[in-house]
């Protein structure tokens, strides 16, 4: 384990990580899910009200552990690193199907009275070619 202070290299650390220790913020959790990382988060009376739901989501989806205090982090790390538990969390994280990038344009297209196919084309990956001339 290696503890790092503030860094702009979070993407590199997440690529090398087995799980994420952090707060129950939507950005932190979403990044961890995209990187297929289980999470170890804290939720207590001082947690922002809007972030408490994220802790419930983590528990309900079984994609990590929620601690009442980061004073319990050593125990939490030991628990999340139990092979069977880590495998279950990883399986649950991998099973998430985040389609928001497709669903939001489809909803907007419906609101605007446009065909959903238009919205789907707008988020399709672009093909880039390089000229050799």
Name each region found by the language model.
Residues 1-133:
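Nucleotide-activated sugar donor-binding and catalytic core shared by glycosyltransferases
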